[in-house]
A protein has these predicted regions:
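Active-site-proximal beta-strand/loop segments in catalytic clefts of secreted hydrolases
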Residues: 17, 39-42, 98-99, 161, ...
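Conserved redox-cofactor binding core of oxidoreductases
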Residues: 116-256
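Short, solvent-exposed loop/turn and secondary-structure capping segments
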Residues: 26, 47-52, 99, 145-147, ...
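Glycine-rich loop(s) and the adjacent beta-strand/alpha-helix scaffold that form part
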Residues: 33-35, 43-47, 132-135, 234-237, ...
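N-terminal glycine-rich phosphate/pyrophosphate-binding loop and immediately adjacent elements
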Residues: 1-137
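Alpha/beta-hydrolase superfamily serine-hydrolase fold, recognizing
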Residues: 16, 23, 220, 286-288
Length: 293
């Protein structure tokens, strides 16, 4: 095993430069007093096929940009396993996916509010409790301008598809005949129906969450980005002091103090004075928690 290099120290250590990680790096580094480290196992997102919309045919199942996970064989698939794409590149899945911009159902956020006991998670809207819709609008730059459902001036570009297909129009007409009604869009809190998806593009090119949140602030002197750095373990401290017991830590017996990672053939420990944030994806984050005890 390689030797452990001298420890680097930051205020916040973010594991995973996907959609959530890019946004968190943007917001946390907005305070110049915060030293922020963003860790990404993959490389930069400057490959031609990432930017071209059809390029997801070349980025998915490609180890340059994808973890290349596959599912277990399933009887419902005649024993086949299928590709389970997870981005391994700056921008994460937003750099390799089909660019579909689709919010959840309003009822999904009701479940979140019930689970947390916090009404701010409710969908919201005029004269209704909840902040989710308002936050979506704040983040968005919608091609049609601001309205009851969409915002303008935010970082996330939302456009309509640049082409229509006769076969899709025929499918929509057939769906209507069996009771699946055509709707204007999928982002108003009720996704039942058929419509063309909105897409995260700008002038016909992919607009990833790295384009939206990371690249515009990459010049900040208090923001450091490690690429080709594989997080191996969250470092823990068994001694949790009273002044550290806030929020989710109230009943914690152990505190995350840093991350051990593999970079350039060396094991590197990075320390977090304030918080370690796991944004390594639906597979990566649970895996890190498991190997960290």
């Amino acid at each position: 095993m390689p030797d452990i290099s001298p420890v680097a120290e930051f205020d916040f250590v973010i594991v995973g430069a996907g959609s959530a990680g890019c946004l968190l790096a943007n917001r946390l580094s907005a305070n110049p007093d915060h030293r922020v480290l963003l860790i990404e196992a993959g490389g930069r997102d400057n490959w031609f096929w990432i930017k071209v919309p059809v390029g997801y045919l070349y980025t998915i199942a490609n180890p340059r940009t994808d973890w290349c996970f596959t599912t277990e064989p399933d009887p419902g698939l005649a024993g086949r396993s299928i590709i389970y794409a997870r981005g391994r590149v700056i921008g994460g899945c937003s750099s390799i996916n089909a660019m579909i911009h689709m919010r959840g159902q309003a009822s999904d956020y009701t479940l979140w509010a019930q689970a947390t006991g916090d009404e701010r998670w409710l969908w919201g809207g005029p004269d209704r409790p909840g902040e989710t819709l308002a936050i979506y609008k704040q983040l968005e730059h919608y091609f049609g301008g601001a309205d009851d459902w969409h915002g303008s001036g935010g970082e996330i570009r939302v456009e309509r598809p640049r082409v229509r297909w006769k076969i899709l129009d025929a499918w929509q007409a057939a769906a209507a005949q069996v009771g699946i009604a055509p709707i204007d869009e999928f982002n108003r809190g009720d996704n039942a129906g058929s419509a063309y998806f909105h897409v995260n593009q700008r002038r016909g090119r992919r607009w990833s969450m790295a384009d939206a949140f990371l690249h515009p602030v990459a010049h900040r002197p208090n923001l450091t980005v490690y690429t080709h750095a594989q997080a191996l373990q969250v470092l823990m401290d068994d001694q949790v002091h009273d002044h550290q017991r806030r929020g989710a830590w109230t009943t914690a017996q152990r505190r995350a103090t840093g991350v051990r990672l593999l970079k350039d053939g060396q094991i590197v420990d990075v320390r977090a004075r304030r918080e370690v944030v796991l944004s390594a994806g639906a597979i990566g984050s649970p895996h890190l928690m498991q190997v960290s005890g």
